[in-house]
């Protein structure tokens, strides 16, 4: 569970995007389909990566309210 997990998933998403680029059917909407596919993959990956990294390295440490504060 580290930064390398995020990089590995990025490579997987890039491979799916590259496969989707070549699999899209030819036609007048080919550009629209490719753009939609790549934007969807990018947005979903960014949402997952930011959420994962925020949980991995939180800015504010969680505190328990039932503990006594010590000096």
From Swiss-Prot:
Side of membrane Lumenal, spans: 1-2, 57-71
Keyword Nucleotide-binding in record: no
Example of a GO MF term: proton-transporting ATPase activity, rotational mechanism
GO biological process: transmembrane transport; vacuolar acidification
Transmembrane stretches, start-end: 3-23, 36-56
Topology versus the membrane: Multi-pass membrane protein
Keywords, alphabetical: Hydrogen ion transport, Ion transport, Membrane, Transmembrane, Transmembrane helix, Transport, Vacuole
Top-level taxon in the UniProt lineage: Eukaryota
Cytoplasmic face residues: 24-35
Localisation: Vacuole membrane
InterPro entries named in the record: ATPase_V0-cplx_e1/e2_su
One term under GO cellular component: vacuolar proton-transporting V-type ATPase, V0 domain
Assembly and binders: V-ATPase is a heteromultimeric enzyme composed of a peripheral catalytic V1 complex (components A to H) attached to an integral membrane V0 proton pore complex (components: a, c, c', c'', d, e, f and VOA1).
Function as written in the Swiss-Prot or TrEMBL entry: Subunit of the V0 complex of vacuolar(H+)-ATPase (V-ATPase), a multisubunit enzyme composed of a peripheral complex (V1) that hydrolyzes ATP and a membrane integral complex (V0) that translocates protons. V-ATPase is responsible for acidifying and maintaining the pH of intracellular compartments.
Similarity section: Belongs to the V-ATPase e1/e2 subunit family.
UniProt-recorded name of the protein: V-type proton ATPase subunit e
Taxonomic source organism: Cryptococcus neoformans var. neoformans serotype D (strain JEC21 / ATCC MYA-565) (Filobasidiella neoformans)
Gene from which the chain derives: VMA9
């Amino acid at each position: 569970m580290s930064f390398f997990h995020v990089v590995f998933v990025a490579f997987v998403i890039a491979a799916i995007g590259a496969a989707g680029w070549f699999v899209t059917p030819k036609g007048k909407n080919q550009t629209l389909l490719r753009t939609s596919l790549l934007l969807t993959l990018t947005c979903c990956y960014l949402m997952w990566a930011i959420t994962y990294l925020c949980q991995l390295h939180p800015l504010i440490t969680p505190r328990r309210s039932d503990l006594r504060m010590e000096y």
